[in-house]
């Protein structure tokens, strides 16, 4: 398995180049992070490699992982040091900064699948969703003896496939925090994921991402627009219809583009109705964005499935199904390491494609079929 391969690769001269190439995008990232510090016992750079290798390694728990790499890796931290570092607020800030820098580099080097539609120029587009890990071994139980899964909210850049961790669910006031409550706790900068001022941001969410009052505030104050689907019990008052170019291939399947007023919010939002030509299914999409062709609104929502595929990767490729530790900081650290590992994999896949012509043809076919 790749995880074991990368942990052994550190000293095995036969396969050393693969590890060097896999981790190459991380070179010098530590030096550019404001929270980086000189730590002789376990450097920030070594901590990045330990955490990422923990994600891709095959061992089922932290103790077994540290034991498996200690004979080959001289920088292996002691078990107590590993778990203490997981709970370090400073290291978490550093890891977030490193992932943000890596995501920015991905935007400079990876092909942009949205570049084919000029109308999207000036928009950064992210798919967001919640994801759960099983409770950690030492997580507290409630009065009934129940441990609750740990919820996280992530966002995937649909231009680069770079993965960002937004936050862990409230560990104190909620047993299971709703996505919208997590979103409302975030700073404006966090919700824009490093997007430069002047560039609009589109967040594509499932039905858990609907709050029309908040959508309006995000649009007016932050330049953030939402795309989602209506819940079954929502009631709308029909407003004026929007004109669109039915002859444009991007609008294939569009049967309506109209403004509607939700019963709970008497400001118009946009509703696009789409019939899938292949399956005959009718979908309705809601958005606070008023200018893009309706077919692009639908296409962006369909691309939201990409983040579900990343979650499948977390669970069934990385085998990351359980929280590593109990503190909120440690749980966030694990989530950021998952993002770093995914982002390095995306860059490595690009290298394999460009230099060796190796592609994941089966997944490419599945994705084309979804879209």
Task: Kindly label every feature range from the protein language model.
Residues 296-298, 351-352:
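Short conserved micro-motifs at the rims of enzyme active sites and ligand-binding pockets
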Residues 320-370:
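Basic, amphipathic alpha-helical segments enriched in Lys/Arg and hydrophobic/aromatic residues
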Residues 280, 302-309, 335, 339:
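Generic recognition of short, well-ordered alpha-helical interface segments
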Residues 90-100, 145, 226, 316-339:
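Compositionally biased, low-complexity linear motifs
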């Amino acid at each position: 398995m790749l995880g074991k391969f990368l942990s052994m690769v550190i000293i095995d001269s036969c396969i050393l180049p693969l590890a060097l190439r896999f981790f190459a995008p991380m070179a010098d990232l530590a030096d550019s992070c404001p929270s980086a510090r000189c730590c002789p016992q376990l450097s920030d750079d070594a901590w990045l490699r330990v955490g990422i290798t923990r994600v891709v390694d095959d061992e089922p728990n932290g103790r077994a992982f540290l034991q498996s790499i200690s004979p080959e890796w001289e920088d292996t931290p002691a078990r107590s040091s590993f778990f203490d570092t997981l709970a370090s607020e400073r290291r978490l800030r550093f890891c977030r900064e490193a992932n943000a820098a890596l995501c920015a580099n991905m935007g400079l080097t990876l092909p942009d699948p949205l570049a084919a539609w000029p109308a999207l120029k000036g928009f950064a587009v992210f798919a967001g969703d919640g994801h759960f890990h099983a409770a950690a071994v030492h997580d507290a139980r409630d009065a009934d003896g129940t441990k609750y899964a740990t919820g996280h909210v992530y966002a995937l850049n649909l231009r680069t496939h770079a993965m960002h961790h937004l936050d862990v669910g409230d560990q104190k006031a909620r047993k299971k925090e709703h996505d919208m409550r997590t979103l409302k706790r975030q700073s404006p900068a966090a919700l824009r994921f490093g997007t430069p001022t002047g560039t609009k941001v589109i967040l594509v969410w499932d039905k858990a991402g609907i709050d029309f009052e908040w959508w309006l505030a995000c649009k007016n104050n932050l330049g953030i627009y939402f795309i989602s689907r209506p819940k079954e019990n929502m009631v709308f008052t029909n407003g004026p219809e929007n004109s669109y170019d039915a002859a444009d291939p991007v609008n294939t399947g569009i049967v309506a583009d109209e403004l509607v007023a939700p019963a709970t919010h008497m400001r118009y939002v946009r509703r696009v109705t789409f019939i899938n030509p292949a399956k005959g299914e009718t979908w309705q999409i809601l958005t606070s964005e008023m200018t893009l062709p309706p077919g692009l609104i639908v296409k962006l929502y369909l691309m939201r499935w990409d983040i579900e595929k990343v979650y499948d990767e977390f669970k069934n490729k990385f085998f990351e199904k359980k929280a590593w530790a109990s503190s909120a900081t440690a749980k966030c650290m694990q989530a950021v390491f998952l993002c770093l590992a995914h982002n390095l994999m995306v860059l490595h896949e690009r290298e394999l494609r460009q230099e060796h012509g190796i592609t994941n043809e089966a997944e490419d076919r599945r994705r084309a079929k979804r879209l």
